[in-house]
Amino acid sequence: MPETEKPLFGHPWIFIRGVPSLNFLPPEGPPEVAFAGRSNVGKSSLINALVSQKGLARTSNTPGRTQELNYFVPDGYSGEAGDLPPMAIVDMPGYGYAQAPKEQVDKWTKLVFDYLRGRATLKRVYVLIDSRHGIKKNDDDVLDLLDKAAVSYQLVLTKTDKIKAPAVPKLLAETADKIRKRPAAYPYLLSTSSEKGDGLDELRQAIAETVGIANWK
């Protein structure tokens, strides 16, 4: 199969770099999607489940551990001109950790806002919401940031296996109503469970459509 026809989620992904400041960003090239969410929302687990690789994104029981923008791309590309990966997934630092020092929070906010505002190749941010807790104030603050930066974002419920199945459609409807008037919000929400695999294909397809890739599995 030619390199350009590799299914997006049908072969391994690799970590290429952590970005502690904008100086370390890779050159703009392939389209990017980013994942944002509160500490311990299940962000790393969801990225690992998406690409079917348990150890790709580091998971931790320590909230606030990830303090960089972590870049992941499909393997098999040199990264040189003419052989770039088709897209990148960016794992953003978790937010909302109550014990994080103010200096750390300020640094995170500046890094994220500068990235959001200035990254032309960023196509969408997937904001993860823990289905057990719904939208919290920290989430609203980040949605405000995204609206201000005029970056398209889509909400994704995580850990739906932790709530009763009949509650999921109601939660989706309630959450959609809460963001209905937000200017940068994509109106269609997704629900996922990394543990059970629920909703992963829908999220894979959404990502592929966002970056303009037809062959995703």
Curated annotation (Swiss-Prot):
GO MF terms held by the record: GTP binding; metal ion binding
Residues at which GTP binds: 37-44, 64-68, 91-94, 158-161, 192-194
Any one of the GO CC terms: cytosol
Domain EngB-type G: 29-213
Alphabetical GO biological process terms: division septum assembly
NCBIfam families: GTPase_YsxC
Entry keyword annotation includes Magnesium: yes
Protein name: Probable GTP-binding protein EngB
CDD domains: YihA_EngB (cd01876)
Gene (UniProt): engB
Source species taxonomy: Bacteria, Pseudomonadati, Pseudomonadota, Alphaproteobacteria, Hyphomicrobiales
Family, similarity comment: Belongs to the TRAFAC class TrmE-Era-EngA-EngB-Septin-like GTPase superfamily. EngB GTPase family.
Annotated binding of Mg(2+), by residue: 44, 66
Keywords linked to the UniProt accession: Cell cycle, Cell division, GTP-binding, Magnesium, Metal-binding, Nucleotide-binding, Septation
Organism for this UniProt entry: Rhizobium etli (strain ATCC 51251 / DSM 11541 / JCM 21823 / NBRC 15573 / CFN 42)
Function recorded in the entry: Necessary for normal cell division and for the maintenance of normal septation.
Listed transmembrane segments: none
Keyword check for Ribosomal protein: no
Pfam families: MMR_HSR1
Cofactor requirements of the protein: Mg(2+)
Residues annotated as signal peptide: none
